[in-house]
Amino acid sequence: METILKIDNIEKYYGNKSNMTKAIDGISFDVEAGEFVAIMGASGSGKTTLLNCVSTIDKVSSGHIYVGGKDITTLKGNKLNEFRREELGFIFQDFNLLDTLTAYENVALALSIQNVPAKQIDAKVRAVAKELEIESVLKKYPYQMSGGQKQRVASARAIITDPKLVLADEPTGALDSKSAKLLLERLKHLNEDLMTTILMVT
C-alpha cells in the first residue's frame, strides 16, 4: 500500500532558549493510502500544532514530513502554494466558509483557482453535493445554514480537488451531538466509499 503521509522524527519548539516550550517531541508515524487516522489527546498536547505542521501553516523545528513521497518541509513560494492547493484538503472546526459566497461558490472556489473549465466545475460540485447531501443548500449563504450543513459544505470543499490527504481539525467541535455523529458518518463514507485518506485531530 502507498504511504501518503510520513512523519519522520519531527519536533516543534516555541519561544527562545531561556523560555522554550516543546509542542512536539520526536514524533514519527505513517499514514497509508485510504486510511482514516484520528489523533486524540488532551487540550494543549500538540495535536493542532502537528496538524499545522502537516498542512504547512507552521514549520517544524526539526525532522521531516513527506506527503506522497515529497518532503514538504523544504517547499517554498509557488511550490508550497501549489502543494497546498492541489494535494491537501482542509476541514476546520469553525468551517472557514466565505460569508459573501453561496455554498456552491464556496465549494467551487478551489477548482476555479485551478482554472478548471466551468462545465467540469459544475458537474463536480453537483456530484460532491449529492454525496454529502447538500444539494438543497447550494444556493444558500453560510448565515442561512445550520452548523451541520456548513460543516458538510466545508467537507465538500475539502474533497472537491481529489486531494491526496484531507486534514480535519476537531471538525465536530462546533456541532451538537446529532450533527457531530452525522459528520463522522460522512467522513467515514468519504474514507470507505471514495477512498479519501483522512488525518483527524479530536
Regions found by a protein language model. Name each.
Residues E2-T202:
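ABC family nucleotide-binding domain
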